Swiss-Prot record:
Protein name: Low molecular weight antigen MTB12
First and last residue of the signal peptide: 1-22
Source taxon at top rank: Bacteria
Family according to the record: Belongs to the MTB12 family.
Main localization (coarse): secreted
Function of the protein: May play a role in the development of protective immune responses.
Alphabetical keyword list: Secreted, Signal
Subcellular location: Secreted
Propeptide: 23-48
Gene Ontology, cellular component aspect: extracellular region
Length: 168
């Protein structure tokens, strides 16, 4: 009988452990635990990416461009990449004539100073350009527009304005 009691006690213990395990499983079977996040701050702005620097040329880039345009040893036919839309044949001949005439009269070389470079419309910038030369009593300053079309160049309107000013 002792053996029957041992078996009965073992079965009872196994049943108790099984019941306990079943109870734990049934608690877990109730579904996953869902945690809800409580907002702490209302109306706080999210950090933004820093603003990108405006696309503007350097004074050295623009001065180099202007020096290239004013070089009497290079034909305007080869300066098309320096002016928006290029330089047509007639325009090149007129500009070459005016530049050679200026060189003959001692008006060259010209010296350029570029200041106040500001971004303008998309892909363009403006700058104050001061021009001085041997026969200029004081520097002449004009606000000039440059455009970026795969490289910085003088806008067509500014090029025509400078060409007309040079003719006076």
């Amino acid at each position: 009988m002792k053996m029957v009691k041992s078996i009965a006690a073992g079965l009872t213990a196994a049943a108790a452990i099984g019941a306990a395990a079943a109870g734990v499983t049934s608690i877990m079977a109730g579904g996953p635990v869902v945690y809800q996040m409580q907002p702490v701050v209302f109306g706080a702005p999210l950090p933004l990416d820093p603003a990108s620097a405006p696309d503007v040329p350097t004074a050295a880039q623009l001065t180099s461009l202007l020096n290239s345009l004013a070089d009497p040893n290079v034909s305007f036919a080869n300066k098309g990449s320096l002016v928006e839309g290029g330089i047509g044949g007639t325009e090149a001949r007129i500009a070459d004539h005016k530049l050679k005439k200026a060189a003959e009269h001692g008006d060259l070389p010209l010296s350029f100073s570029v200041t106040n470079i500001q971004p303008a419309a998309a892909g363009s910038a403006t700058a104050d350009v001061s021009v001085s030369g041997p026969k200029l009593s004081s520097p002449v300053t004009r606000n000039v527009t440059f455009v970026n079309q795969g490289g910085w160049m003088l806008s067509r309107a500014s090029a025509m304005e400078l060409l007309q000013a040079a003719g006076n």
